[in-house]
UniProtKB/Swiss-Prot annotation:
Site label Cleavage (non-hydrolytic), positions: G189, S190
GO cellular component: plasma membrane
Protein name: Phosphatidylserine decarboxylase proenzyme
Cofactor comment: Binds 1 pyruvoyl group covalently per subunit.
Organism taxonomic ancestry: Bacteria, Pseudomonadati, Pseudomonadota, Alphaproteobacteria, Hyphomicrobiales
InterPro entries xref list: PS_Dcarbxylase, PSD-A
Cofactor: pyruvate
Length: 232
């Protein structure tokens, strides 16, 4: 293996959405260096933090249509049965909701919790209250996807927070997504809600750390044997 290959395999990829921010931090750091050199080094540290924030590592996603995979890195902040947002059109029956809260240090790339076809994308303007609060799922700015899976329709909702005020979603209606496939990003702290129909059993508890594209949040059916994973 060459030195270049070693470096490439060691460094964590940065998502393209972060390039502009990293460039701005870097240029400002150089400019501050003309005023006072220590400011330049502080700026370089902040530039490195910005690159770390927009990191986009590969993940090993379990291959199983019965598993619901975490759509983001973070902490499980809620496991409850609630009504889904009206704009998703998921009906009038309560659904299992599992929420993953992302702080500013988590990787903020969002991934599909299950494989399927995107049936609806619904954006709703709103407030920017703390995304950890339960009311954030109804009051905050959000963008929801409805995905048709073999177990029926599920919802995954990107929710803005106090700092995060830019929700990005680059998939489209009628698109096919694989479990663990990247579909969006929320800048600087936020939350993802996953809404699941009857038959889904949670496999996580509140306070548990979740890894996007890898951690199993819930499962349809009984537990099975070893699961094969693929790189995503």
């Amino acid at each position: 293996m060459s030195l270049i290959d070693t470096v490439r395999n060691t460094l964590v990829p940065v998502h393209r959405e972060g390039y502009r921010f990293i460039a701005i931090f870097f240029v400002v750091s150089l400019a501050l260096g003309f005023l006072w050199e220590p400011l330049m080094w502080i700026g370089f540290v902040l530039t490195a933090w910005c690159a770390y924030f927009f990191r986009d590592p590969e993940r090993m996603t379990p291959i199983d249509d019965d598993l619901v995979i975490s759509p983001a890195d973070g902490t499980v902040s809620s496991v409850a049965t609630v009504m889904p947002p009206e704009e998703l059109g998921l009906g009038s029956e309560p659904m299992l909701r599992i929420s993953v809260f992302m702080n500013v240090f988590n990787c903020h790339v969002n991934r599909a919790p299950m494989g399927g076809t995107v049936r609806r994308i619904a954006y709703r303007a709103g407030k920017f209250v703390n995304a950890e609060l339960d009311k954030a799922s109804q009051e905050n700015e959000r963008n929801g996807l409805v995905i048709e899976t073999k177990h029926g329709q599920i919802g995954v909702v990107q929710i803005a927070g106090l700092v995060a005020r830019r929700i990005l979603c680059w998939t489209r209606e009628s698109a096919s997504l694989e479990a663990g496939e990247r579909f969006g990003l929320i800048r600087f702290g936020s939350r993802l809600d996953v809404f699941l129909p009857a038959g889904a059993e949670p496999r996580v508890t509140v306070g548990q750390t979740a890894t996007g594209g890898e951690t199993v949040l819930a499962e349809f059916g009984s537990a099975k044997g070893p699961v094969i994973s693929r790189r995503a």
